[in-house]
Amino acid sequence: MKKLLKTLLLTLAMPLAAQAQGWPTSYEGVMLQGFYWDSFKETRWTKLQKQAPDYNGYFSLVWLPQSGKTNGGQSMGYDPYYFFNHNSSFGTTDELRSLINTFRTNNIGAIADVVINHHQTNGWWSFPRETYGSETYQLQTTDIVANDDSQNTGYTTAAQAVRDGITLSSNYDEGDDFSAMRDLDHKSANVQRIVKAYLKFLVNDLGYIGFRYDMVKGFNGSH
């Protein structure tokens, strides 16, 4: 417990930006960052769950890393591949649900790290097909912004699309490019449909009570 508290960042949950997004003006809670880079063993869901009673009364929120499964080995989750499969390097989906439920019984809310600016593919173009409830979800190449990876001279996504006969979105990136993964077109109806379902899944199925959005410089805040 002491090692974790020394290592993890303690953040007062009352910055001006948080107030602008709807935090009560009298909020006095404290948020704990429940991970650090490559803390796969130290902050596994099962370990955090055992420490939940120690947090009770001191922390109101715990910020967890992006918990969806990626397409590879150990990962912090910031190369997202699946929206609805949350068997990650930190534990299984069931272990995550159990952790969040234990937090709740100890008066602690879990904050999800939401990575929706970019998405990992299998190769250049292949996105996984997922089913949740009675609906099927899958990103398409037309959900990739027209100028994806434009900063990478000689191997832009657009040039590769021409070589492969692939159609991208006609819309350009609304913010900073994230190299090496496909930046998503947030004007796309398909992207919007998937993201909305994903956020509902995080709250209604997994039990998160709020979000921290990653790479917010990459897309328009109006979305």
Report each predicted region and the residues it spans.
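Hydrophobic h-region of N-terminal signal peptides that target proteins for export
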Residues: L10-Q19
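Sec-dependent signal peptide recognition
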Residues: K2-L10
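Active-site environment of divalent metal-dependent phosphoester hydrolases
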Residues: F219
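Substrate-binding/active-site clefts of carbohydrate-active enzymes
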Residues: G22-T46, K50-Q51, G57-L206, S222
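Short catalytic-loop micro-motif centered on adjacent basic/acidic residues
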Residues: G210-V216
